[in-house]
């Protein structure tokens, strides 16, 4: 008897969809729905707050802080220079972002004229030399400085694969370990930013400003493995 492969494929697809639905997979939503408040407020400028570091890796804070400027600018936002911002915040004894994440952000709107403040919380940061991996977990919270409403909130749990492939298994292990050990800390931060900020709606200075509302929003919590 001739097998109807199209019918079989359709049946498998429908069965898989049913399984995913029964496991609680949420239906996709548009960016306009996921980030309704951001589209409503249309922030033009962003103040990047010093990261909140929950790990024992002191270097993680600087790496994340230094890696956020360019991705936000490329998304069409005016971003206050992190270096100047940090100096100003330190002069006002305001460089501890943890103090402000749940407090009023109006002073940042009045003093710095920033429309929004970006908080990042570093939850995991470690290198595993033998596995040639860098593991990074960061939460991103963009809040309005006018009314403290959350405009964008996502988290990334990223494993950066630094492995190197040769024709020798032992050499692979050694070279990969060295590659991981020498990897700049900023590599992990950049990969996490890539995962999360690519889903941020475009700002006024980007070509798709207010044209990306119908695009499907990415998941709130992203986990994955990327090559270095």
Sequence positions of predicted segments:
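Bacterial N-terminal signal peptides that target proteins for export
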Residues: 2-12
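C-terminal motif of bacterial Sec signal peptides marking the signal peptidase cleavage site
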Residues: 19-22
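Short histidine/acidic/glycine/proline-rich micro-motifs that form metal-
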Residues: 53-56, 126
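N-terminal segment of the mature soluble domain
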Residues: 43, 55-119, 149, 181
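Surface-exposed short loop/turn segments
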Residues: 96-151, 158-165, 172, 212-228
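C-terminal/domain-edge helix-coil "capping" segments
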Residues: 24-42, 146-228
């Amino acid at each position: 008897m001739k097998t109807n492969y199209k019918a079989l494929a359709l049946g498998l697809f429908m069965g898989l969809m049913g399984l995913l639905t029964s496991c609680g997979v949420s239906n996709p939503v548009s960016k306009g729905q996921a980030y309704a408040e951001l589209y409503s407020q249309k922030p033009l400028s962003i103040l990047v707050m010093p990261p909140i570091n929950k790990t024992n890796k002191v270097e993680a804070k600087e790496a994340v802080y230094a890696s956020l400027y360019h991705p936000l600018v490329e998304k069409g936002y005016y971003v206050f220079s992190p270096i100047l911002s940090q100096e100003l915040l330190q002069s006002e004894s305001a460089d501890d972002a943890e103090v402000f994440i749940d407090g009023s952000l109006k002073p940042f709107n009045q003093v710095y004229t920033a429309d929004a403040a970006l908080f990042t919380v570093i939850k995991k940061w470690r290198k595993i030399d033998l596995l040639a991996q860098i593991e990074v977990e960061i939460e991103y919270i963009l809040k309005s400085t006018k009314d403290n409403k959350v405009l964008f909130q996502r988290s990334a749990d990223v494993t950066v694969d630094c492995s190197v492939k040769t024709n020798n298994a032992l050499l692979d292990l050694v070279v990969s370990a060295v590659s991981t050990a020498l990897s700049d800390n900023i590599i992990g931060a950049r990969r996490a930013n890539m995962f999360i900020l690519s889903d941020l709606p475009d700002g006024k200075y980007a070509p798709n400003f207010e044209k990306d509302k119908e695009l499907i929003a990415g998941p709130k919590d992203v986990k994955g493995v990327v090559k270095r």
